[in-house]
Each structure stands twice: as structure tokens, then as C-alpha cells.
Amino acid sequence: MQSVSIEAIKRDTGKNAARRLKNQGYIPAILYGKGMAESIPLAVEYNKLQRLLQKHGRNVLLNVIVDGSTHNAVIKEIQEDTLKGKIIHVDFQRVSMYEEIEATVPLKFEGTGLIESRGGIVQHQLWELTVESLPDKIPQEIVVDLSNLEIGDTLFVKDIQVPEGVKVVDDPDEIVVSVLAPRESEEEAEEEATETAKESE
């Protein structure tokens, strides 16, 4: 996991304060977690946060700078306006670099085109994994190579290779991907089976 700095300012609570911040290009945030007696209401520049997320994704180790002090943190939650799709609030969780944390990591699938070229249909059940590791070991994404799968094969959580120092929390027997036969092929197989049964009668 990369380490990226973002500056934040302390904010007053209340609707009027929130409106002023919005007019200045800020969105509300909050910092809480390890070693903190109480949470700190913050505000971050919307455009800077957007650029950070576009470049690094949500699984990024942050140096949240507040009044000259730096806090190691991760993005715990992002709230979005469901209609506009814009971020309206972000939670930063302060972490210890020496204690493991849980994080949700997206899966990046490779080899799908090869399966489809062989006539298979890739059916996804999981698009992300929950993992546990030290903050600086959490990957931004986990690459899953599907190129060796054949029609009828199933890939389970336990089959996915993760980086050293990373432990998967999800059920190892949970299905990630199944490779199905094309519907036409299934129907043809059923018709052939029916005809064979009739001939045997």
C-alpha cells in the first residue's frame, strides 16, 4: 500500500459551518481510531480528494496532516450523494503501523477474454476480498489470472494467491468465479441426451 499525504483542517460542526465549507470547495471528514481519546471533525478539499482517489484508489495509506501533525490513516468509509454520485463525507481511521487491520481489496481479473474465446461464460460471484495485514502491506488490488480455467471449472477464495504478509478473512470455500458453457451448448446437450434416451427405448 502506498503512502500519500493529504492536508485537512479542523472544522466546526453545524449546518451553517458545513455550508460555508462547501462553498469554499471542502467536504466534511472525521478522523478517529488508534491512540485517539476522541474523534476530530475535519474538512478536506474536494478536488484534492478526488484526484487522490482517481490516482491511488481507496486502498491507500494516508498521511493526514492536521495543524502540522501527521496521522497515519486509511479511508474507512466514503459517503456519496446517490443522485449526483459526488462524495459528501469521508471517514479517516487512524492506524498503528505495527498492528494489523482489515481492509476490502478489489479483485482484478485477467484472462477473461481467453475463456470467452474458447466459448466459456465467466460468472462472477465475488469482486473483492476482505484481508488482514499491516497497513503498509495491504495491496491496492489483487490480480486473479483466469486463463487456465476451462468450462465447468470453479475458482474458490482459497485458490487466490495473495502477497506475503496478507491473510484472507473471507470463507476459503466461497466461490469467486465459475466458468459456464454457452446456453446453446447446454440446450444442444440436453437435446442430444433426450434423443439418445428415445433411441434406447
Curated annotation (Swiss-Prot):
Biased composition (Acidic residues): 185-194
Entry annotated with the keyword rRNA-binding: yes
SUPFAM superfamilies in the cross-refs: Ribosomal protein L25-like
One Pfam family matching this protein: Ribosomal_TL5_C
Disordered: annotated segments: 181-201
Keywords: Ribonucleoprotein, Ribosomal protein, RNA-binding, rRNA-binding
Disulphide bridges: none
GO biological process: translation
Gene Ontology terms: cellular component: cytosolic large ribosomal subunit
Keyword Transport: no
UniProt-recorded Gene Ontology molecular function terms: 5S rRNA binding; structural constituent of ribosome
NCBIfam families in the cross-refs: bL25_bact_ctc, PRK05618.4-4
Oligomeric form and interacting partners: Part of the 50S ribosomal subunit; part of the 5S rRNA/L5/L18/L25 subcomplex. Contacts the 5S rRNA. Binds to the 5S rRNA independently of L5 and L18.
Purpose: This is one of the proteins that binds to the 5S RNA in the ribosome where it forms part of the central protuberance.
Protein name (database record): Large ribosomal subunit protein bL25
Gene that specifies this protein: rplY
